[in-house]
UniProtKB/Swiss-Prot annotation:
Gene name for this UniProt entry: atpF
Membrane topology summary: Single-pass membrane protein
Alphabetical list of InterPro entries matching this protein: ATP_synth_b/b'su_bac/chlpt (IPR002146)
Name assigned to this protein: ATP synthase subunit b, plastid
Keyword check for ATP-binding: yes
Pfam families: ATP-synt_B (PF00430)
One cellular-component annotation, GO: proton-transporting ATP synthase complex
UniProt keyword Metal-binding, yes or no: no
Length: 180
């Protein structure tokens, strides 16, 4: 391998002016190589690069359009959901208000019904007490009357003789006669 390298270097150093030879100046060689590669890339790679960039651009544009459509659809769905939520919240609030008012009404009805029942029970209690009191009074009157009659009968039986009995009958008959 050393022999080949020495041979190429010797050819380059011995080449006469105006002929084709090996350039040993690295800076110039590198610039020439870069210019050749760039020229080839521009000439042959221009179409490929344009197609690649156009395809990439189209994909990006399509992705953006799809994203915009999805975003618009999501915004519409969100607006519909928010409107539905607002409607449902209003209905729930209305039901709550209606429910509370119905509960309050039922509570008032129950209180009124209980109050009326208590009044009826109180009235019946008073009537029952009055009836029992009247019955007790009547029982006491009857007992007192019976006791009084028994005492009167005892007194009369003890003090009544046949003369007094005849005298009482005559007085009563005469009173009846004056009444006619």
């Amino acid at each position: 391998m050393k022999d080949v390298t020495y041979y190429l270097i010797s050819l380059a150093s011995q080449s006469p002016a105006g002929s084709f030879g090996l350039n040993t100046n690295n800076l110039v060689t590198t610039l020439i190589n870069i210019a050749v590669v760039l020229s080839l890339l521009i000439v042959f790679g221009k179409g490929f690069l344009r197609d690649f960039l156009d395809t990439r651009k189209n994909r990006i544009v399509n992705t953006i359009q799809i994203s915009d459509e999805l975003y618009s659809g999501a915004v519409e769905k969100l607006e519909k959901a928010q409107a539905r939520l607002c409607k449902v919240e209003k209905e729930a609030k209305q039901l709550r208000v209606t429910g509370y008012s119905e509960i309050e009404q039922e509570k008032l009805n129950l209180i009124n019904s209980t109050y009326k029942t208590l009044e009826r029970l109180e009235k019946k209690k008073k009537e029952t007490c009055s009836f029992e009191q009247q019955r007790a009074i009547n029982d006491v009157r009857q007992w007192v009357l019976q006791q009084t009659l028994q005492r009167v009968l005892k007194t009369l039986n003890g003090s009544l003789n046949p003369e007094l009995h005849l005298h009482t009958i005559r007085v009563n008959i005469s009173m009846l006669g004056t009444l006619k």
